Amino acid sequence: MIRSVVALFVFALLLCGYIVLRPGTPPRALTGDDMAVTRGLGDSILGPVPDVIASLDTTVVTPAPLRAPAPSLNVLTDNARMAETTANVLAGLGLNVAPTPDTTTADPMRDLTASVLSGIGQITGKQVTAGGETPAPNTSLEMLVVQALQQGQSDAYIDTIVNEAAKAGTITVPQGLVTANGNVDTAVLLYSLIEKARAAAGEPPLPPSGANEGVEFLSDDTEFRRVYTVGSGDSLGAIAIKFYGSVDKSDVIYQANRDVLSSPNAIQIGQRLAIPELAG
Amino acid sequence: MMRVLVAMIGILTALQAQPSYAQTVNITADMASSTFTVGARTFEISRTQDPDATLQGEFAKTNRPCPDFCIQPMIIASGVAPIGELEVIAFLQTEVAAGTGILIDARLPDWYEKGAIPAAVNVPFAALGAENPYLADILHALGAIEVNGEMTFDAAQDLVVYDNGAWDEQATRAITSLITAGYPASMIKNYRGGLQDWLHFGLSTVLP
């Protein structure tokens, strides 16, 4: 008898305790560490949260897929520089060219832009294929040119296949290689190949081609300026060869004309570009 | 008798196991969570189900030094509407899901990588400055079209821009740069409360 009274008493005690403590004290005591961010982070590292756990108290988080490679949003261009493209083609041809010392080695803006474009591409869905698969890699411009050169094709042939591929959007083209007519300036690419190959072989650099058509010399009291009017078929790379003898200098012209050029590939027929003297 | 006690404790334990798992912290009275699909990805926004949660760490601070962390205006530029959490969620559900809008996280990548609003795209304010030679590429990706050397934004995306909060000028700078680049103010909205307010409501974040 005594035992059952004691048992009932203990039960009543537990029941009271339960009723008193229950509201506001969920079984899983939560500490300050349970802040939304902290949990959010943990969840996506661990992957999808099972429904049971999610329904307890967790903010459900859909884990993001891995970042896709920077997409080529513009059909014609990407942010690669001529020097890289050239080096890749020469490497593809088996010519061992020492990497060009790039004056603009670190280009944080380029990297930043590439990751921005990748992010926008993922959201707008233009680059991400269904199911989150990474898009098939483009045939590279370098591969096309290497193959054509190995086959001994003519410059005109290379020009045609490169432009067809660029228009179909299957390759991307580096900065400064798009002409005012919107074509790919294959001649400049081929020139750049010769230039680098000569440099690698220890031969002197090619002289500037230096045609004077479209060039004006302006002077005022303080300075002497060269201005070049963009003609049909000009690319920034071609203009750089014309004045400096090197494709790599196209960035000098671009930087001097930032007020009229929104990108190195945005040159227009009739645009008047300042051609600065090279320092030193 | 022992068995009675054990049974009673058992009943108690069973009672204890059931309660308090139903959602009680909704977004609004009739919306517990928001689910939307962008491309191939599905996102869900809900709130932490802990009535006692408080802000922790970086976002619990109230008095960062100004400068550099100064209180930002409600209206950054004429025509740029300030919005709150419900408008951000509605924007994600309708415009972003339909592909006509982009939620822009204007913070630098190191902030973004610590957690962002679901489906936000990181477009750091620095990438939108006129000093970025590749700015035109970003504007094109946002839907701007170049006609005769002029950027036109008729087909461009509607944007909602946010940063860490009202004490953070990264969104202000991003919006100012966008307008300088020609983006119409009427197509930009500012979630001024930013991540601080978002977290203050215990709303979901994702790791990019």
Summary of predicted features, one role per range:
Chain B
Residues L139-D197:
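Catalytic cysteine-centered active loop of the rhodanese-like fold, especially the PTP/DSP P-loop
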Residues A77-G84, L128-L135, W167-Q170:
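Phosphate/oxyanion-binding active-site loops and adjacent basic polyanion-contact surfaces
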Residues Y21-K114:
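Flexible, polar/low-complexity N-terminal or interdomain linker segments that lie immediately upstream
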Residues Q93-Q157:
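Mid-length scaffold segments of soluble, non-membrane domains
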Residues L108-Y112, A127-A130, G165-E169, G194-W198:
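Solvent-exposed loop/turn segments at secondary-structure junctions
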Residues L12-Y21:
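C-terminal segment of classical bacterial N-terminal signal peptides
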Residues M1-A7:
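Bacterial N-terminal signal peptides that target proteins for export
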Residues F201-P208:
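Active-site neighborhoods of enzymes that stabilize oxyanions during catalysis
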